[in-house]
């Protein structure tokens, strides 16, 4: 069996940074699956469509190319909302599922998202669910956006993050939740180095090879 590390969790919990560092430490390719949904949402918005429309989302999936996933404007609040809406569409999730599984199956991988351990790679030998308090996550996302020069109002962002959490947890297909055998890592009071150290210990315990 290849080493597959599934890293799930809500927005701004630190899963992306952690996944990248784990991939580097264990010599594995990394896939931020959230970028796939962000790219689909971005395409819908650019076309003046409705991210909640199955037809608009299906069109965006059909024209998705790798370059779209590399765009620099995928991590802004309006795309956060669009990504959450298209991700609730079963047809979109099904269309992107094979891509994610193929990526993981090649040589092992680190994948981060919201349903890696529960749906995409349910047999992954290492599953992490990274979380943090709502306030900690809000402050991290504010800092991230402002460091990139994105103008954002704190209360509006708070409301949007809360709404996304609720949508992700309540959707019928692949709701956000820890896998039964996932290790929960609360990063509320951890910096990036501390979170990585704890995650690395979990991986080496689960995969002592």
UniProtKB/Swiss-Prot annotation:
The gene is cmk. GO terms for molecular function: ATP binding; CMP kinase activity; dCMP kinase activity. Coiled coil: none annotated. It is an enzyme of class 2 (transferase). This is Cytidylate kinase. The keyword Phosphoprotein does not apply. Keywords: ATP-binding, Cytoplasm, Kinase, Nucleotide-binding, Transferase. Belongs to the cytidylate kinase family. Type 1 subfamily. HAMAP family: Cytidyl_kinase_type1. It is found in: Cytoplasm. It comes from the Bacteria. It comes from Granulibacter bethesdensis (strain ATCC BAA-1260 / CGDNIH1). One of its GO terms (cellular component) is cytoplasm. Its EC number is 2.7.4.25. ATP binds at residues 9-17. The keyword Transmembrane helix does not apply. SUPFAM superfamilies: P-loop containing nucleoside triphosphate hydrolases.
